[in-house]
UniProtKB/Swiss-Prot annotation:
Transmembrane in keyword set: no
Pfam families xref list: C1-set, ig
Ranges for region CH4: 328-458
Region annotation CH1: where it falls in the sequence: 1-106
InterPro entries for this protein: Ig-like_dom, Ig-like_dom_sf, Ig-like_fold, Ig/MHC_CS, Ig_C1-set, Immune_Resp_Modulators, Immunoglobulin_dom
Positions annotated with a glycan in the UniProt record: 46, 114, 212, 261, 277, 284, 445
Intrachain S-S bonds: 28-90, 137-200, 249-308, 356-418
Record's subcellular location: Secreted
Entry protein name: Ig mu chain C region secreted form
Organism encoding this protein: Oryctolagus cuniculus (Rabbit)
Keyword terms: Disulfide bond, Glycoprotein, Immunoglobulin domain, Secreted
Cross-referenced PROSITE patterns: IG_LIKE, IG_MHC
Chain spans, region CH3: 223-327
């Protein structure tokens, strides 16, 4: 009897629009195999197995002198809408050979993105030394969810200072499932005032959607696209140092603020104490506002969801946005290196620059602080770059921080410590210390000074 390996075909549901209440049926057809014994299993793209409780395998059917069989898996549509998976893997074991087949999630409809870029108000630039602010690019209403966002300055791609959030499913009633994504670019005030042209480039299914802005855009008479809401997640530095998580809900393009209300609530609907702050009017005659609330760091780290609700007389219904700590980003701890001042700089007897290089970490949220003789230094004593993607390691980031001290302090043997905080580190924080006598960095136990600022959250 000759053996015949199975040929695999994908099967997808022909039902209507995806909603959070539906199960998406996906299947795998194996045909023309011999002998008749065959085994199906399913996994996600990241190789994690799918529970057999959601898998149904139908009896083998004889077709001519060979056999065929099918397997079905039911996946909650919210996983399809909100997850990062693009396909499932159907795995078929047969005595003649094992075969794998990618079964792509169904695309409810193909819709292009609506791209908007929000420019910074003139009074939003802040910081000691180099003053900075952010451009925000938002793409909404698109499907399918696969999309990428990049930034250009005067036609050249910008690599540093970019923070792009994961794609989110848009919450709405009946109709096709659509998605949104936002990306932020940190810019300096000098670059903005120099009339540099910034471009947010959105790539969706091989088609580019470009939106250009510059300082002259502030004087544009283009009408407002309507009230926009941007929930901003707390940074790791905030949650680690204060033991509380600060939730920010940014509302832009307000024509009036008298009827505005911003509120935060936990996943069970319990209202959180929300402080609302109204900015001054912008050059395009609109306002911005922020609603801030604080929750325990433990609640945020556990993945609990929090919802910002915005009401205003210009809105036909309240706008709601829900955020939670992302669980889909792979965690990788940073490697930390401290470099002493260059000999050529010390010869000048003017100043000494100590550099802290932080490499290979994920997610991108990290903080760097400096200490002298174990005491924290003020942030105006050092400059830390925004995390940037590692050129040779996709998914990982690097940053560097430079501390400038007097040549006298360095030559007198003062110790300088780079303290790095990241959620993937065993104790959330690590440090490296260097001084003139060693000439090389030394690893010490984590200082307790930083924890003195932490408060207990009840």
């Amino acid at each position: 009897v000759s053996l015949s390996s199975p040929t695999l075909y994908p099967l997808v549901s022909c039902e209507g629009a995806l909603t959070d209440g539906n199960l998406v049926a996906m299947g795998c057809l194996a045909r023309d195999f011999l002998p008749s014994s065959v085994t199906f299993s399913w996994s996600f793209k990241n190789n994690s197995e799918i529970s057999s409780r959601t898998v149904r395998t139908f009896p083998v059917v004889k077709r001519g002198d060979k056999y065929m069989a099918t397997s079905q898996v039911l996946v909650p549509s919210k996983d399809v809408l909100q997850g990062t998976e693009e396909y499932l893997v159907c795995k078929v074991q047969h005595s003649n050979s094992n075969r794998d087949l990618r079964v792509s999630f169904p695309v409810d409809s193909e819709l292009p993105p609506n791209v908007s870029v929000f420019i910074p108000p003139r009074d939003s630039f802040s910081g000691s030394g180099t003053r900075k602010s952010r451009l925000i690019c938002q793409a909404t209403g698109f499907s399918p969810k696969q999309i990428s966002v990049s930034w250009l300055r005067d036609g050249q791609k910008v690599e540093s200072g970019v923070l792009t959030k994961p794609v989110e499913a848009e919450t709405k009633g009946a109709g096709p499932a659509t998605f949104s994504i936002s990306s932020m670019l940190t810019i300096t005030e000098s670059d903005w005032l120099s009339q540099s042209l910034y471009t947010c480039r959105v790539d969706h299914r091989g088609i580019f959607f470009d939106k250009n802005v510059s300082m002259s855009s502030e004087c544009s008479t283009t009408p407002s696209p309507g009230i926009q809401v941007f929930p901003i997640a707390p940074s790791f530095a905030d949650t680690f140092l204060s033991k509380s998580a600060r939730l920010i809900c940014l509302v832009t393009d307000l024509t009036t603020y008298g009827s505005l209300n911003i509120s935060w609530a936990s996943h069970n609907g319990k209202a959180l104490d929300t402080h609302m702050n109204i900015t001054e009017s912008h050059p395009n005659a609109t306002f911005s506002a922020m609603g801030e609330a604080s929750v325990c760091a433990e609640d945020w780290e556990s993945g609990e969801q929090f919802t910002c609700t915005v009401t205003h007389a210009d809105l036909p219904f309240p706008l709601k946005h829900t955020i939670s700590k992302s669980r889909e980003v792979a965690k990788h701890p940073p490697a930390v290196y401290v470099l002493p001042p260059a000999r050529e700089q010390l010869v000048l007897r003017e100043s000494a620059t100590v550099t802290c290089l932080v490499k290979g970490f994920s997610p991108a949220d990290v903080f760097v602080q400096w200490q002298q003789r174990g005491q924290p230094l003020s942030s105006d004593k050092y400059v830390t770059s925004a995390p940037a993607p590692e050129p040779q390691a996709p998914g990982l980031y690097f940053t560097h921080s430079t501390l400038t001290v007097t040549e006298e302090d360095w030559n007198s043997g003062e110790t300088f410590t780079c303290v790095v905080g990241h959620e993937a580190l065993p104790h959330m924080v690590t440090e490296r210390t260097v001084d003139k006598s060693t000439g090389k960095p030394t690893l010490y136990n984590v200082s307790l000074i930083m924890s003195d600022t932490a408060s207990t959250c009840y």
